[in-house]
Amino acid sequence: MNKSVAPLLLAASILYGGAVAQQTVWGQCGGIGWSGPTNCAPGSACSTLNPYYAQCIPGATTITTSTRPPSGPTTTTRATSTSSSTPPTSSGVRFAGVNIAGFDFGCTTDGTCVTSKVYPPLKNFTGSNNYPDGIGQMQHFVNEDGMTIFRLPVGWQYLVNNNLGGNLDSTSISKYDQLVQGCLSLGAYCIVDIHNYARWNGGIIGQGGPTNAQFTSLWSQLASKYASQSRVWFGIMNEPHDVNINTWAATVQEVVTAIRNAGATSQFISLPGNDWQSAGAFISDGSAAALSQVTNPDGSTTNLIFDVHKYLDSDNSGTHAECTTNNIDGAFSPLATWLRQNNRQAILTETGGGNVQSCIQDMCQQIQYLNQNSDVYLGYVGWGAGSFDSTYVLTETPTSSGNSWTDTSLVSSCLARK
């Protein structure tokens, strides 16, 4: 529901016949510290996502599930949609996690990556144990928050030591591989994400910049290295933008073929569209149609997953602390319909907001919708943790004290799974 009309509807419900105040559909109805309405509008029910947040879900019945309060486990209720357009699911999405950033630091949207600005989330990167502890963060996210997937962004230039089309640099790949192996050791899925915006130093891959052969060389080497690791997920490219989508789809096809031919025959590969991978533009900008033609060498689309991003601020940039939308009506609902019609799946590999109440409300609503539609949405990965510190507007980096970690409010309220 449009937030601008929600206060008017709420006021009307109070004035009309002296009725008890009711929360509107998708509005917050409970949680630790909540002092607003706890009764939901007719046709919806209050659903507890976790101890910090509950919301009014339309057309709901209740089922029992387990959530994690600050001091230990408890039993609460979670609402599940019974609408035929959004098939109910009690288990939610398969994958939930966070980006562990740092190897991508220094990369800008024109595909320039200054390797001297890389800030790896490896505690012992220089042997002095004073770098961010990305592996420790992942261990916390798995053990305390029930997370199952991590995206590990890295710049193309870093991996090949600025040698376009060259071999993986032995020093660089060994450092990056420490993060990958740390992720794998936790039993999680690990997304290798090339964070170059479909570019190298300003030139678009396969469109006047690096050749497809130079790009597939990178992916052939990475796929060969991780071919035996079933939980390594290949994220072809971060946020392509301003590309010819049909030409880009042809590039993606070459990469998929190269990965499979390198021996990584069954792992997940995520296919990114145009317009910064926007979930809201995936259909309208032609990405869905173009990338639907990408196949494995045998002609199947098994484990080829559409890769989308969506932030919750006013301009979808992920640069503002406050959130203004839950992205359901404008992005995830129409995309879910298209995915079902075409028997495909997608994963949300970047989403985030500030650690403020507006984002807790909107993000929890967005995550709840993805969980209710897990037949087409495989999961979500928040942005971001790793080498981000507490001053970053979208930080999801937990703070450590001794052997314990404390999550940000957005993670504990919305992204955590237990």
Curated annotation (Swiss-Prot):
Residues 58-91 are annotated as: Linker. GO terms for molecular function: cellulase activity; cellulose binding. Its EC number is 3.2.1.4. Keywords: Carbohydrate metabolism, Cellulose degradation, Disulfide bond, Glycoprotein, Glycosidase, Hydrolase, Polysaccharide degradation, Pyrrolidone carboxylic acid, Secreted, Signal. Residues 63-91 are annotated as: Disordered. It catalyses: Endohydrolysis of (1->4)-beta-D-glucosidic linkages in cellulose, lichenin and cereal beta-D-glucans. It is found in: Secreted. Disulfide bonds join 107-113, 183-190, 323-359, 364-414. Residues 1-21 form the signal peptide. One of its GO terms (cellular component) is extracellular region. Residues 22-57 form the CBM1 domain. This is Endoglucanase EG-II. It comes from Hypocrea jecorina (Trichoderma reesei).
